[in-house]
């Protein structure tokens, strides 16, 4: 007896916010490649992270005043993203923004391997938000990977 099942294509209608700890990601990439010149390729990274889901927000948090206007313009032009300069670390501004966005999105993707985000991940999951971490695996906290709903290496 064979079941003849027709599969119906399901449309995933999820809203995603991508929050980037720029300094953490840059340090990780530079450490792995041993080059200060290596940069993220957002044109391949963002679509891969979204995986056919809708982008609600993209915010790149960067410590310091020397933020590339080219990066800022590119993120705005292609992803309606923004770059937020931070006085010191991005941890607090990123955490505040994630908490503010929790009721507006289905998923938050945090680009950072920093263990400082473990409590934020726990809090957001408690609020019902799916949390994904995208980072360089070799420099990412194992606890952060365990707490996340999904880890993008």
PLM region spans:
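Domain-level signal for Mg2+-assisted phosphodiester chemistry and nucleotide/NA-binding surfaces
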Residues: 2-92, 103, 130
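Nuclease catalytic cores that cleave nucleic-acid phosphodiester bonds
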Residues: 64-153
């Amino acid at each position: 007896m064979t079941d003849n099942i027709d599969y119906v294509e399901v449309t995933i209608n999820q809203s995603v916010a991508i929050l980037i700890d720029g300094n953490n990601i840059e340090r990780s990439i530079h450490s792995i490649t041993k080059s200060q010149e290596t940069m993220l390729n957002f044109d391949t990274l963002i679509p891969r992270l979204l995986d056919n889901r809708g982008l609600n927000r993209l915010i790149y948090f960067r410590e310091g005043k020397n933020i590339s206007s080219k990066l800022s313009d590119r993120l705005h032009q292609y992803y309606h993203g923004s770059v937020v300069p931070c006085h010191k670390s991005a941890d607090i501004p990123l955490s505040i923004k994630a908490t503010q966005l929790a009721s507006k999105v289905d998923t938050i993707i945090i680009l950072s391997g920093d263990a400082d985000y473990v409590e934020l991940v726990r809090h957001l999951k408690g609020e019902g938000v799916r949390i994904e971490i995208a980072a360089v695996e070799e420099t990412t906290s194992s606890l952060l990977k365990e707490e996340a709903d999904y880890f993008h290496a």
